[in-house]
UniProtKB/Swiss-Prot annotation:
Residue segments, region Disordered: 40-145
Modified residues (Phosphoserine): S80, S81, S127, S393
Chief location bin: other
Protein name (database record): Synaptic vesicle glycoprotein 2A
Source organism per UniProt: Mus musculus
Annotated segments matching region Interaction with SYT1: 1-57
Post-translational modification, as annotated: Phosphorylation by CK1 of the N-terminal cytoplasmic domain regulates interaction with SYT1. N-glycosylated.
Keyword check for Transmembrane helix: yes
Free-text tissue specificity from the UniProt record: Expressed in conventional synapses and cone ribbon synapses in the retina (at protein level). Expressed in diaphragm motor nerve terminals (at protein level). Expressed in hippocampus neurons (at protein level).
Assembly and binders: Interacts with SYT1/synaptotagmin-1 in a calcium-dependent manner. Binds the adapter protein complex AP-2.
Function: Plays a role in the control of regulated secretion in neural and endocrine cells, enhancing selectively low-frequency neurotransmission. Positively regulates vesicle fusion by maintaining the readily releasable pool of secretory vesicles.
Amino acid sequence: MEEGFRDRAAFIRGAKDIAKEVKKHAAKKVVKGLDRVQDEYSRRSYSRFEEEDDDDDFPAPADGYYRGEGAQDEEEGGASSDATEGHDEDDEIYEGEYQGIPRAESGGKGERMADGAPLAGVRGGLSDGEGPPGGRGEAQRRKDREELAQQYETILRECGHGRFQWTLYFVLGLALMADGVEVFVVGFVLPSAEKDMCLSDSNKGMLGLIVYLGMMVGAFLWGGLADRLGRRQCLLISLSVNSVFAFFSSFVQGYGTFLFCRLLSGVGIGGSIPIVFSYFSEFLAQEKRGEHLSWLCMFWMIGGVYAAAMAWAIIPHYGWSFQMGSAYQFHSWRVFVLVCAFPSVFAIGALTTQPESPRFFLENGKHDEAWMVLKQVHDTNMRAKGHPERVFSVTHIKTIHQEDELIEIQSDTGTWYQRWGVRALSLGGQVWGNFLSCFSPEYRRITLMMMGVWFTMSFSYYGLTVWFPDMIRHLQAVDYAARTKVFPGERVEHVTFNFTLENQIHRGGQYFNDKFIGLRLKSVSFEDSLFEECYFEDVTSSNTFFRNCTFINTVFYNTDLFEYKFVNSRLVNSTFLHNKEGCPLDVTGTGEGAYMVYFVSFLGTLAVLPGNIVSALLMDKIGRLRMLAGSSVLSCVSCFFLSFGNSESAMIALLCLFGGVSIASWNALDVLTVELYPSDKRTTAFGFLNALCKLAAVLGISIFTSFVGITKAAPILFASAALALGSSLALKLPETRGQVLQ
């Protein structure tokens, strides 16, 4: 009996030993998997347990981990003392051995951060497990943020400026280029799309408006989310939304679906400007920030030039189209819409190779991720400069104390979409709270003044840049009307018309037994005329009307002479057979006017190149405020030259002049917006101000274009007053040149 009891006790003790050994090895393998980090940025591998044996079959090397006598006793006796119970001697590491990514909480007494600030067992400036009670939390976060700003600037200087920043520059430039393309797409396709989709004037106006509406919503939405979810992630999502719906819009046939796709395409691209500038600024040291953010602005100009060049090269080529029956038509303007999605697609592919902003990681307490990205920046630049041996010396980086914003979701909280709804509401509340913090007493004055500057700048710039082409078209129409030929009181009998009539007025004419076969009528008007025993076949017309005319025994076969083209006219015993299918509205289609739109836009966007270069070279020398105010004053002065624009060439020259001097103020405003707000509010504030910019653009376009053909005084007065007000407000803002990024 006793022998059986001893056997059972030995069996139980052996089972416990086996279980303990399995548990120990399982824990070690988990830790080993976590600590064996592949540094994807420097391509170096590190492992805490590189030389540790996983199995007793492979003895540890002579220089392996220290194993004390307690461990030998445990192996020999199968027991452990109270002093060593729960302690895994295999995890002891020699001093100086790599122990994974440096972490802020791993610093011991006497250790210091990169900027020299002491760090003793803290993370984000707070002791583990301790948080500042009550109102001390925000004060501590503010103090942490100030220390982080100084240290982050020091780290960026150590990382240097080189290949990494230039690579990111071109990647983000593609995203900014996509925004520049989006602004011009609808305006370029309207002359062609209006006939395919049979667009009335109100529909065309809504199509132009919907793009700005989508960009306004997208700027606010993605700007707010980028401060919570990350710059890179939100930019990838927003560009994906833009490219997907831009692709769909090139194939859809109906006006409603096309409008919907362009709306969502605008929502997607709306996040480009606020995220791109914030993202890039967080990789730039103070002495490089103003200049290189200004260089980045050039890609918006490149986007406009790309759109104008592609429209010029693609849309007039009718051979690039096909159709399947009468229901589906794919014309060349749809190819243009598809090509305009390429910058966004390429930006997505390139952005997947780039890391998240390390400043965003640090603001959200992710020390290890930030350290890895900064190490990548350092190693990339040092290798490019021929110094691969230089080691990234930073070991500890300040992080911001994180407030607990998590919500508890019970496991029985309905279905999965209800749980996602709760998370979405929580995220929305955080975004809204962050937006409201931009109006806190600390930032209220800056935000209100920036709203004024953004609104006035956008109101005048977009209003004038759209007013210029409209004025050019008006001058063309006036010149065209001045060359109209008038034929009064003509009498024509037994004549066949099979040629083109253009820009003519026929008054009091009489037409007997005449045939109009294969005739094209363009801007032709028949007034007080009589048509008797006439025959119209295969007639195509645009801007053609019959006013106060009489038709007797006349046949219309396969024509597009719809009812609205007969104004106060009588049709006696007349017949319409097999009218042409398609849009019954009178549209002009593509032609010389469309070419002029492409040409004017091409020159207008290309003209900002000198202003971009000058602003980039002087931004860090004269300061943001002087650049902004000076450019606004020059733009205001250039407005007064509009009174001399009495010809097409003069208006084109004035458009180029205004664009060239005003671009510097936009560059300065972008840099100023980035530097005035802290990292946790940067894209939120930028997105809100950019959304306000799009609202001002809609108002400016609506007001300025309403005066086309009426007066030039009102646009000159409105633009000058807005620019003067904006420059005066800008001078009251704080100068950010020479300051570290908050």
